[in-house]
Amino acid sequence: MDAEIFFNPYLHTKRSRRDWRAEPAADNKESFLQIVPRGVLYDGATGLIKTQCELSPRMFFEDREYVLDPVMVWPGLDIAADGEAVPPCDFVFHTFDQVVSLVFAEGRGRARRWRQHISPAGNVIRLFGATALGTPVCVNVFGQKSYFYCENRPGEDLRDVIHDLADASRSPGPLSASPSRRAPLVAVRLRPGDIPHLYRVSFNNWSMARKVGALMVQEGRRAYEIGVDPLARFLIDRKIPSFGWLRVGRFSRRCNGQTSTAVIELDCQVGDVVAGQPLPNWPPYRCLSFDIECMSASGAFPQAEVLDDIVIQISCVCFVVGGSGAHRFTFAEKHLFTIGSCAPVEDVWVYTFPSEYEMLLGFFIFFNRFSPDFLTGYNINGFDIKYLLHRMCRVYQKDAGRFTKLRRGGRFFVNSPDGSGDAFGGRSGVIKVFCAGTVVLDMYPVCSAKTSAPNYKLDTMAERYLGQRKEDLSYKEIPVAFLGGEEGRARVGKYCVQDGARQGPLNVIAYHYEAAASPNLARIPLRRVIFDGQQIRIYTCILEECSARGMVLPSLPSSPPSSGGDGAGLEGGDGGTAGRRKKKRSGSAPDGEDEDDPEGGDEGENGECRENGLEKEGSQGSASGNVGYQGATVLAPECGYHHNPILVFDFASLYPSIIMSNNLCYSTLLVDGSPPVPDEDVLEVVVGEATRYRFVREHVRRSLLAELLVRWLKQRKLVRDAMKACGDEKQRMFMDKQQLALKVTCNAFYGFTGVAAPMLPCLPIAASITKIGRDMLLATSAYMERHCNDVEFLVSEVGVPREAVDRDALRVKIVYGDTDSVFVGFRGIGREVLVKVAGKLAAAVTRDLFRDPVRLEFEKMFVSLMMICKKRYIGKVYGENKLCMKGVDLVRRHACAFVRSIVSEVVDVIFHDEAVSEGAMRLSEMSFEELRRQGVPVGFFPVIRRLCDARDDLFLDRVPVAQLVLSSVLSQDASRYKQKNLPHLAVYRSLVERGEELPGVGDRIEYVLTCPDESKKRAPNYEVAEDPAHVREAKIPIHAEKYFDQIVKAVTNVLLPVFPKDMPRRERFFAYVLPIRTYLPEVFLRMSKEDRECGAYLARESGLGMNSFIVYGEDTCGSRVGEGPGRGEGLGVGGGEGTRPPRKNGHARLVSGCLYGSRPFNKKDRFVTLHIE
């Protein structure tokens, strides 16, 4: 450890080392804080070396020294595609990202042609993209005005009003106010005609326009569309796709004074850009996937705010998305940035740096030189990007914005949920990343939204989508390996690179193609599709339609103006900053689990509120919270097990079809002050007891929303038809993403009108949609029960063969109804017949009850259905072997493997064994009194038997310890927990006492529940938790009773609908029916033949049978004591010596009061006697 193994030129200068806390030297040289892990100088050493360095930052690659400079040629990157010819006019390129900059005319190099648009300051829209060959392009669009509409009071000079509202120290700059003829969206509130005294106010400066508009609304003036930024105006007014091909007619190419890193940079005016051909193909875009590794000086989970919690390695993987395979740049695929010397890593370019700052600087220079169009990774929004930006911008006080595609005015920042306001139309609670000219695609929120999995660790997703498992390296091993020497750093580097290399899910899920299908429909940038919800999409769609119709949208006092979420900023302004709140990541995955209790409470039964046979789905409210309306309808479910055909019908595009068929819209709503309309021209919707909403009919005024929906649904149908005829797999994928974008946007209209804190709220529309949908569901249910119980209707209208109907058994009943679906149970008609005629039945309902385009469709048929409660059911679909589950987790996510397997087996046998299915249905139809008299149906015995077998396996120690392991995350240092009585903390303390290797913060601590002393039978989990390795080594018996209790609770939670509805304490069902078995220590099992015969004699003489005298276990020969061939065939007791309890009507007799589990054994007794009352 004495020999220095890594030469650091900054630590070997002849000058004395300066104190790192000292102020930088007062000369022209720029110094920086150098933080170096001591272990890169001395193998195995811990701690950090800090010094203030005045030399130039540098890196080492393949025994060569490089001085780090933002304009350096990076080794391994050859992407400066040169020589692509630029035509004198009609330049065609593909755009993927747009940024709005506020530019000042004082800047040098401004041609007079462009200066007029930015004097003294003006908007410039940067269109980033690429040519067909992949050459980077940036087009600077000048002349886009920021404007809104407002009503001027008679006798006022609008210009004077605006100057008064503007800051006294700042002029609003050039502005124009011209009369405009526009109608309001809610036009029926006024007399026919345009808004009187309406003016369009235009500014060069977007920030000033936003400020003045907001102040007008605050003063009570009527203003319209004040929150629409210049980029949205450009895309909507010019019909420009935000992700697609564009053509620039006239332009001038910048050869000097470029503001971007693009190879081709053009200047043009707003009228020079037009939409190109709507081709689905992309040019080759550069994508960068990266991952970081950090090291905490305290051993806790690294935090960027802590000076000593440094970044030690960064991996980058470069690849191309889109294109046909031909492009004009080449580059190495895998790169590793590391502090200290590093052994070679196969197929990886390794760059070594003397300190953290130099490594960060090297990474950002590499990022700038590679200039990725897409930045991806796993949980990079919540951790990696935030960490890098905080270290670079806050710790080292360097501007990260200058490494983006904009040389001046670039911004690179993270907007955390606790930030100071989201952009207009943004989603709260979403971490947003802005990087000028680069679209960020974090695959963690994508995978968590599109995948149902026990956890969303990268390893789990990679195994799911790629069939790969990574070489795992725990957090506690990373610092040791990194500080151990070159080979250790290479091992950490290989681990880091493999995380960055797993961009496979991006290609498998193809989310980048899905996201790219939405911008053109909504006229919003791709980044807003990714980070902002549906609100902004619907708003811009309505805005575009209103603009085409000569209408304006109102601005609400509570609506915040756009905060520049699309990149409005100052050229030459300060750079981006990192997010203010750190989102912790547990372990090596961002799933954020907290301490888990494997014995958590059971889910409740049916606690929903019911009213007139309906269950309230919930309520929506206005932003103020004082007005609400009842949410979607849920018909009260027939809870239980249904082993008869259940037809499921649903409405196609329910909410869009309601809007279209009933002509609902802002523009058709009659409000106070509306002109009188004849009753026959009005649709009246009664909501509640006294609230009435009125909308004019289609022949009076056509709904704007309806026309949008009709257009999009027709377009979606054309796309779906084209998919069927398309033979190109890639084109089919493009089309599929396009039709999905149309579907999602159509379905979002309902939420747009009624969601809390909306952009354009209209409670009457949302409440009317809900009420009409509720009436449709009730009408469908009544129609089904009234007509389908009539044989003649089934034969004549639906086409059911007369001989296929069992008149005596025919019974049709609504089992469940939920928003847009109806579950109809049929008896007396075979499954095959029902499947054939279900479509005709749906058509008959549509024809008799609804107007076009409302359409009821047959979705599927359940052969068996276990209805647990609303929105929770399990069913077996006709023609499929896989079970359909909704709202049901068979077991808690953190249950052990053995519990999960038993619950799955029980559910499978109920749905796939015909006899068990019949038994379950019979049991669900029984009353508690019938159950007491007749006992559990014979068909249900396999379930009882499987639970008994599971209990045997636990008590007889036949379950491997690995299947009984539970785990919880150590989310912080063990000493910082306020609650000490947690199982995983108890295991941690045990490891400390035994001097074993301790887990680190973020690791999952595994534990097993062990058998306590006889005096602590009811000991809590933290008293019996133990490390699995120690349990195996010391052969400690497990706590079989606790594990079996978990099984019983989990099975009961799932099978609750099967138990008699009037049974008291249904959750105790298995306590009543499972036979008692007492498991004896081996010393008591060595019984002679005479002992056994004596027990049999006592059983016969008592008249209770051997079932009441249960001594259960295994003797030395492996045979079971107290058990005969009839084991498990009885109810409430285990069979013994071939005897079975008396039966009546094919059922075993139910014996009340039996208990399950173990009990203390009395040494004086040969048998444990169960007295039955």
From Swiss-Prot:
Disulfide bonds: none annotated. The gene is UL54. Keywords: DNA replication, DNA-binding, DNA-directed DNA polymerase, Host nucleus, Nucleotidyltransferase, Transferase, Viral DNA replication. The keyword Ligase does not apply. It comes from the Viruses. The keyword Oxidoreductase does not apply. It holds the Pfam family DNA_pol_B_exo1. InterPro entries: DNA-dir_DNA_pol_B (IPR006172), DNA-dir_DNA_pol_B_CS (IPR017964), DNA-dir_DNA_pol_B_exonuc (IPR006133), DNA-dir_DNA_pol_B_multi_dom (IPR006134), DNA/RNA_pol_sf (IPR043502), DNA_pol_B_thumb (IPR042087), DNA_pol_palm_dom_sf (IPR023211), DNA_pol_type-B (IPR050240). Its EC number is 2.7.7.7. It is found in: Host nucleus. PANTHER family: DNA POLYMERASE CATALYTIC SUBUNIT, DNA POLYMERASE DELTA CATALYTIC SUBUNIT. Belongs to the DNA polymerase type-B family. This is DNA polymerase catalytic subunit. GO terms for molecular function: DNA binding; DNA-directed DNA polymerase activity; nucleotide binding. It catalyses: DNA(n) + a 2'-deoxyribonucleoside 5'-triphosphate = DNA(n+1) + diphosphate. Residues 554-625, 1123-1144 are annotated as: Disordered. Residues 564-578, 1123-1138 have a biased composition (Gly residues). GO terms for biological process: DNA-templated DNA replication; viral DNA genome replication. One of its GO terms (cellular component) is host cell nucleus. Residues 591-606 have a biased composition (Acidic residues).
